[in-house]
């Protein structure tokens, strides 16, 4: 009886939601991309797949295009899960953002050979970028070429990584030269793909975004093929400085690049059952509304993407030892939250085409 009731309830929820205005409908009318990060293994769950296809016009892999999955051994590439995601996107008329070609985390153990020379490391990175981008040429419209290259120290500096200086690719001490190499290699593999630099805690005007801004300005002046900047927008603050975020978006767009919000979630305090307070859910909705409005104010802010869409699979709980959660647009039962309605209404109210 209980199982039958649950199935009926889910069916009713799907029918009601499908008959209403969706995020995808509203984004299409405003000329925006609205996306989410995806785990391909969850596509086998009918309600996950149905909600994803109905609500979003863009998807991005959470993990399956990162090194540890796609290039697990020196001479071995595994495109199977990435291909599955791309096939889903094509069948549902969705765009795909590739994530990520160069990062300091989630790399396979074989990359951590400290006996390797910078020249050898450079050849490995170049081959990887050209192989992965080439495999998805014409199917992935945009790439996060380099992710989180700047650290959080004061003053901000390039993060010490296997790509920069341990052993690096022969560009240590030469500023953002290794990042430039990555963009040139990606462009050579797919000249039509949009190439983004992506970072965390750089959404407002601050020392990190200043460092990113200086790099992008230099790249644009010298013709380095960079097309955009991604602001991750992982927020734990229910009162972000929206004016500063809007100012930051504007100054990057003035350089001639796009800005995309790439990994948004808004973490809330939760109880032992994972439930947030209604008052916090309303504040969360305000944050989604205000950030989306700040993006939509600028014609060059072209996408709003969340890091997952259902609290059922959010990374926030495990990351915070389950003291935070409820960060996304749908709850664990795929019911839209106040944040969903707030984002949809902002998209519906915009006419930028």
Name these PLM-found stretches:
Residues 10-19:
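Hydrophobic h-region of N-terminal signal peptides that target proteins for export
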Residues 83-95, 169-198, 205-274, 292-297, ...:
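Glycoside hydrolase catalytic-domain groove-lining segments
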Residues 40-55, 82, 122-132, 207-219, ...:
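Short, acidic/polar
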Residues 37-48, 67-80, 150-154, 202-211, ...:
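Acidic-and-aromatic substrate-binding clefts and catalytic sites of carbohydrate-active enzymes
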Residues 21-62:
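Boundary/entry segment of secreted carbohydrate-active catalytic domains
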Residues 34-38, 57-61, 96-100, 141-145, ...:
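Hydrophobic faces of well-ordered beta-strands that scaffold small-molecule active sites
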Residues 23-24, 54, 58-72, 81-202, ...:
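Substrate-binding cleft and catalytic face of glycoside hydrolase catalytic domains
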Residues 281-319, 331:
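Substrate-binding cleft of secreted/luminal carbohydrate-active enzymes
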């Amino acid at each position: 009886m209980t199982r039958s009731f649950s199935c009926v309830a889910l069916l009713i929820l799907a029918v009601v939601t499908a008959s209403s205005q969706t995020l995808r409908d509203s984004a299409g009318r405003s000329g925006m991309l609205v996306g989410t990060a995806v785990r391909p293994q969850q596509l086998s769950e009918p309600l996950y797949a149905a909600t994803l296809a109905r609500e979003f016009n863009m998807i991005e892999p959470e993990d399956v295009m990162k090194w540890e999955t796609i290039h697990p051994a020196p001479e071995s590439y595994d495109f199977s899960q990435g291909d599955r995601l791309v096939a889903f996107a094509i069948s549902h008329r969705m765009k795909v953002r590739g994530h990520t070609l160069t990062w300091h985390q989630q790399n396979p153990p074989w990359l951590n050979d400290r006996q390797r020379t910078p020249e050898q490391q450079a050849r490995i990175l170049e081959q990887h970028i050209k192989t992965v981008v080439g495999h998805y040429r014409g199917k992935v419209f945009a790439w996060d070429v380099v992710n989180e290259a700047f650290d959080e120290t004061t003053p901000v500096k390039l993060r010490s990584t296997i790509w920069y200086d341990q052993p690096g690719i022969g560009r240590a001490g030469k500023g953002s030269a290794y990042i430039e190499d990555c963009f040139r290699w990606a462009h050579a593999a797919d000249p039509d793909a949009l190439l983004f630099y992506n970072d965390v805690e750089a959404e407002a005007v601050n020392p990190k975004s200043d460092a990113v801004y200086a790099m992008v300005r230099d790249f644009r002046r010298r013709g380095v093929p960079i097309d955009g900047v991604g602001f991750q927008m992982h927020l734990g603050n229910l009162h972000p400085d929206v004016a500063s975020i809007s100012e930051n978006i504007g100054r990057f767009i003035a350089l001639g690049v796009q800005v995309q919000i790439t990994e948004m979630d808004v973490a809330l305090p939760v109880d032992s059952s994972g439930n947030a307070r209604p008052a916090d859910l309303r504040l969360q909705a305000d944050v989604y509304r205000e950030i989306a409005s700040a993006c939509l104010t600028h014609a060059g802010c072209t996408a709003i993407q969340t890091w997952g869409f259902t609290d059922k699979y959010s990374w926030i709980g495990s990351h915070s030892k389950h003291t935070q959660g409820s960060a996304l647009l749908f709850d664990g039962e795929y019911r839209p939250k106040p944040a969903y309605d707030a984002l949809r209404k902002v998209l519906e109210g915009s006419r930028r085409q």
